[in-house]
Design a protein with these regions (language model features):
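Terminal amphipathic alpha-helical/low-complexity segments used for targeting or macromolecular assembly
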Residues: 1-7, 12, 18-19, 55, ...
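Structural signal for interior beta-strand "rungs" in well-ordered beta-sheet cores
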Residues: 3-183, 187-188
């Protein structure tokens, strides 16, 4: 059975899973589904058509699933879908999608730190860290194991590649390639995210191949398709390199140089 504080306001149609803890002054809307073992400390608002998995933890004043800030919103049913074992620190905001039938989606094992904002239609993978006051604008895609530094802001429709890292206060207006370290305003690709690769168990062989790809793509003055051709010809085609190439080839906003 869930443990619910008497001051919490929960709609009778909401679904609250077993072993959930709902603290003082939380508000849970009609179309919310909480899986098992979620912990809501106090003053949490979860609203809209929101589906949340198991084992998530919400700290005071987090707001999840509420109506988008996007002025293009015209009504309809929009969704917020969240996986398992995520942490939402104080004053985090996660907004629902804009278009009818669309969703803001988050995977599992993510850490969303205090005052961060996840806007409408964001697709956020697994094992992501969004540091304090980090901002993801609408339709941003964040791949697994990416880290967004404190006060960093990501423009709408940008993508952050797997195991990439943004320095604090970075302003991102184009895609950030996988495995790269990006910093500054305007943002620049500074180096390979060596520490991130090591922490996530990337092999030495793959790390060396990623460094080769980085040097050819960012440091040799090659442009676009020419850089991709050279990397395919000169760098071992390991899965990490293929992912890097697939990412940069499909970029619509360009890659942060």
């Amino acid at each position: 059975m869930p443990e619910i504080h008497p001051s919490a306001v929960i709609h009778s149609d909401a679904t609250i899973g077993d072993d959930c803890e709902v603290g003082p002054y939380c508000v849970i809307g009609r179309h919310v589904t909480l899986g098992q073992g979620n912990r809501l400390h106090s003053h949490i608002v979860i609203d809209g058509h929101t589906e949340i998995g198991s084992g998530n933890e919400f700290f005071p004043f987090a707001s999840v699933g509420v109506k988008t800030q996007d002025l293009k919103w015209k009504g309809g049913t929009t969704w917020t879908r969240i996986g398992d074992r995520n942490t939402f620190r104080e004053n985090v905001t996660v907004h629902s999608a804009t278009g009818d039938g669309e969703a803001t989606v988050m995977g599992s094992d993510n850490h969303i730190l205090a005052y961060s904002h996840i806007a409408h239609n964001v697709l956020l993978g697994n094992h992501v860290i969004l540091s304090n006051n980090g901002t993801l604008a609408g339709h941003v895609i964040v791949e697994d194991y990416a880290i967004v530094g404190g006060l960093a802001a990501v423009h709408q429709f940008c993508r952050l590649g797997k195991m990439s890292i943004l320095g604090g206060c970075t302003k991102v207006v184009s895609d950030v390639a996988p495995y790269m370290m990006v910093d500054g305003n305007p943002a620049r690709t500074r180096a390979v995210n060596k520490v991130g690769l090591e922490r996530n168990g990337v092999t030495v062989e793959a790390q060396n191949a990623i460094r080769q790809a980085h040097r050819l793509y960012f440091r040799k003055g090659l442009i676009g398709a020419n850089a991709v051709e050279v990397i395919r010809a000169e760098v071992p085609q390991l899965p990490e390199v293929e992912h890097f190439l697939s990412f940069v080839e499909t970029s619509e906003r360009g890659v942060t140089r």
